[in-house]
Amino acid sequence: MSNLSPDFTLPINFCANPQDAWTIPARFYTDSQAFEHEKERIFANSWICVAHGSEVARPNDYITREIIGENIVIVRGRDNILRAFYNVCPHRGHQLLSGEGKAKNVITCPYHAWAFKLDGNLAHARNCENVANFDSEKATLVPVRLEEYAGFVFINMNPEAESVETQLPGLQDKVLEACPDVHDLKLAARFTTLTPANWKNIVDNYLECYHCGPAHPGFSDSVQVDRYWHTMHGKWTLQYGFAKPSEQSFKFEEGTDAAFHGFWLWPCTMFNVTPIKGMMTVIYEFPVDEETTLQNYDIYFTNEELTDDQKALIEWYRDVFRPEDLRLVESVQKGLKSRGYRGQGRIMADNSGSGISEHGIAHFHNLVA
């Protein structure tokens, strides 16, 4: 195991050699100080994927998301420009909008009825004409950086951040190659869970298929593990494997070059292009604290009227596949606090980078360090 400092810093070359690597120490998954450090270092300075563009496609459409305690509202203006703001009134700090839906042409604070245009500028503050030196320019909503990229919506709390493409170079082209219809996807189902697991625990689980055989029999019946690869691309990775039809999970015509594409995006989003044409699933992680993560598991199809097979597949995800992963990460989170856990685990990365190799975890842990 590595020599580790008693605080929450790791050697810069941590996990640099996947074939001789150990996991991040358990305390990084369970300690509030570690989480506070990550909130500022990672989440306040990274592009976070929050939704597919179809959720806010029309003027006045809005959604809200909560990330590291910050509530963000994303709204498309009457000028068709999509913007993000901290969801807080600059007057006394009250939240402006909740949930999602169709905003009126002005956003009105429910506390004192200050009203804001959809571009964030102040429309009206009651009695402001009688307040000395009232400056409407200092009473606007505070913007959050936003980009639409590869069909999805990304936000960044760092106003000086470079582009999404700078963080995830080449990702957009690869996603479009895997799913040419990505811009036409429509949300068909969402499973939201407040998962009792650290966000890194959930990412670890996604970044290896070592567990697929024992824990996901339906998925493993479709994926061809001997034709499965995991490649690293800086702050994103790609798991790619050929698929075969299965009565337990994915049903499609045999003889096609059907494949799985599993994209992990720094820090904690997962895009899954399935063997079913015109289908994609996305796992959005929104960390709450060191041992809790809000997850949206979204299923998308290009068609609005679902077929019976699509409905059955949604049920399989809801009742079988999704619970399998939730049970795993919840159990691991408990085990990381056990006296019987030695504090770090050996990363099972083999020399060939096979379909069951855990080199993806080593890559992720090196980025976290």
State where each predicted segment sits:
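Generic structural signal for secondary-structure transition and capping sites
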Residues: 43-47, 94, 211
